[in-house]
Swiss-Prot record:
Organism in which the protein naturally occurs: Syntrophomonas wolfei subsp. wolfei (strain DSM 2245B / Goettingen)
Metabolic or biological pathway, per its Swiss-Prot or TrEMBL entry: Pyrimidine metabolism; UMP biosynthesis via de novo pathway; UMP from orotate: step 2/2
EC number(s) from the headed UniProt entry: 4.1.1.23
Function as written in the Swiss-Prot or TrEMBL entry: Catalyzes the decarboxylation of orotidine 5'-monophosphate (OMP) to uridine 5'-monophosphate (UMP).
UniProt key word Lyase: yes
GO CC annotation terms, alphabetical: cytosol
Protein name as catalogued: Orotidine 5'-phosphate decarboxylase
Amino acid sequence: MQAQERIILALDVGSREQALALVKDLAPHVGAFKVGMQLFNSCGPSIVEEINQLGGRVFLDLKFHDIPNTVAAAGRVITRLNCFMFNVHAAGGREMMRQVVEEVKNEAKKLAVAAPLSLAVTVLTSISQEQLEEEIGVKGMKLKDLVVKWALMAKECGISGVVSSPQEIEAIRAACGPEFKIVTPGIRPAWSEKNDQKRITTPGQALQMGADFMVIGRPITQAANPVEAALKIIGELEE
């Protein structure tokens, strides 16, 4: 995989115009564009089609979590939209994950297209050990152990990989093997402003830990020259 293919640019912007301007400039320099709840709910499914038309691939970050039939039906729609990746909550359980994987595979075969990569979200990065125990009710298990348990469960269900914080990359890689995809959000090059993050993981560090893809937003989108910022990160990954 080439260095630029590892970069997923987070389109955390408020309008179609802002998003498509970034896609036009950066499609040759990144592997995919992350469309999250804000942009998707603002623009609808057409934003995925427009990004594809501009030569970009889409990671649809909607974190599906519902009964198996409902999530499987969503998987069919995502396949028709020609998404590159999408994600579901591992907490939805084995049957939900199995059904969406099967539905996506069948729909892709019917349409003669590549099936999108399916990713599981394990424990949200905003959840602390205390919240896991007191609010969610999971007691007697370390957060990292639960992340690895759910990653293994997702793999057994045919899910392609996980979205993981940098802190769990190495444990997931050791448990799930080299073919299981790991997508890591919140990556920031050392030269970028840290904003509200006290600790950062750089693209190079994430790659060394075992990440396949890294989600990067503000260090590129808010740079004076986004293309130059992307090229600088590509250079770091190639070192």
